[in-house]
Amino acid sequence: RIDADNLVSRHVSIFGMSGSGKTVMVRRIMDELLKKKYPMLVLDIHGDYLGFIQKQKKLYPKNEVKLFYPNLSVSSEDKEIIYTLIDKLGNSLTDPQKDFLSSLLEKVKYEGGSLLKYIELLVRRAREFAKDPTKFSKSVRPASMYVVVRSLGQVVKKLKNMEQTNFRHRQKMSKLKFEELPDAATEPEKIINKGQLSILYLKGYENLPASAIVSILLENLFKHRQEVEEEIPPFLTIIEEAHNFIPSRSEDKDNLPSVETIRKVITEGRKFGTGVMIISQRPSRLDETIASQCNSQIVFRMVNQKDQRATTRDSETLSVDDSKQLPNLANGQGIISGQVVNFSLPVQIKFDADLINDDIGNENFITAVENWDDKESVKQRKKFAKDFSNITSIDRRRANW
């Protein structure tokens, strides 16, 4: 029997190779927590948890299951994250050009809203300054300003491409109701509420933008839990493919904004009722500080020796002898250790067909190729382009500067 309170308050890690059973285990835990009406936020990259909203009426009639797509809402307070995004996604800039970008972010204030709209505003203001540099600074050459304008344009293009990719994947699941992610700074209760499961569908977003979205989201939710008023109840954040958000320093991705945010949440979270569950097939690639804060581990089949060593390094109760058994485990077999149990226990998880999204399922690639139709594929791409164009034109008409 797993101690539910220790699971949601003292953090847990779930590791295993692809197909070993870790995601099935996560869904089973979520199923039990939903019955207790415990609030959860899931960062879902591949759509592994969309079955919850599809089966909600049948399995969870007393719960709210919300399915969100990303909306990177920012304000001038997020200028460090914005600068990192522009610097990494845009063209390579010289030091004077980077100085101009930093000064531009300081000068162009933004009360809050879409990152894309803010960058488009930066483009307009940068062009104005380039036409009349005296409005900005005599020390910055117009040529440098135009280089920054082009770099900002590249960022806009990349972000729009990611939006389109995410939209294309959502179109394949037209039966599901997707909502734009509310602003966690002003409407946290729409994301975290008693009995509510919130799933953020991140498919199509590259590591850095996804990291920025997660960082701003969790930072704002954590602030609300720190406040005396407690606008939102305690909740559990489930981070799928965690190595994308909290990579180790050896991965040379320590500049991802989500690393510092999750590090803060996982080290201080217990005091404020914000638990974290991290899931990964590569524990050796995770930030050691964050992984070591997980007081319980559930480990499935694992053959990579680096990953085996990482599981024993981060666990106080998983022994070296236990880790030697990991390569021999069958799919669905694992070991539970830490504060959720009195002593290390073997576990056998059965496949949860009732929680699989029918539109995704376990795809058979041979069947997919046999049923492939080039004409239908072209038709679908044209339909997508038209639908996305209609949505973006509506957004442009709504824009209010």
Language model regions located:
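Conserved ATP-driven motor cores of ASCE-family P-loop NTPases powering translocation/secretion/packaging/pilus
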Residues: 88, 263-350
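Glycine-rich phosphate-binding loop of nucleotide-binding enzymes
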Residues: 1-69, 288, 336, 366-370, ...
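Conserved helicase/translocase P-loop NTPase motor core
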Residues: 167, 171-235, 249-254, 261
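Loop/turn-to-beta-strand initiation segments
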Residues: 36-41, 194-197, 232-236, 272-277
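Walker B catalytic acidic pair
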Residues: 45, 234, 240-241, 248-249
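The conserved Walker
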Residues: 18, 206, 283
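Helical/strand "switch-coupling" subdomains that flank nucleotide/phosphate-binding cores, especially
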Residues: 61-179
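Conserved P-loop NTPase motor module
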Residues: 332-401
